[in-house]
């Protein structure tokens, strides 16, 4: 499996204020419903269509105020993957966040989409940090 790690971003809040949102897919509904097709979510699962692929995700592990592990849950995504949302509280008003992706990619897929996956992780974590810092 290939590992992709986002840049670390700073959120000016304690981890206890961030964790409830990143550990519950239903809280993402307002932000994502108009960006993907057929968005459906419960606390621990979600599914949607993105660029012709049906994506299903399931939260498989939660460690309060530390991390959330998400894995693929059915769908038509042509790879096995897992990703983590990691939180590290440095002080009461300073939590660092990063995303880690493990994906099973053959050599050709790695060459075709590896840089896009890395860029996507970096953009996603920047967006998460910006959103939490605006609240």
Q: What are the functions of these language-model segments?
A:
Residues 18-22, 28, 46, 59, ...:
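Hydrophobic pocket/interface hotspot
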Residues 30, 35-78, 135:
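Glycine-rich portal/gate segments that line the openings of hydrophobic small-molecule binding cavities
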Residues 1, 38, 59-60, 87-89:
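Short secondary-structure boundary/capping segments
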Residues 75-123, 130, 134:
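Beta-strand/loop substructures that line and gate deep hydrophobic ligand-binding cavities in soluble
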Residues 8-12, 58, 86:
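Generic structural detector for well-ordered beta-strands
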Residues 1-40, 45:
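Hydrophobic ligand-binding cavity/cleft-lining segments
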Residues 2-8, 45, 54, 67, ...:
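Intrinsic-disorder/low-complexity, polar/charged segments enriched in Ser/Thr/Lys/Arg/Asp/Glu/Gln
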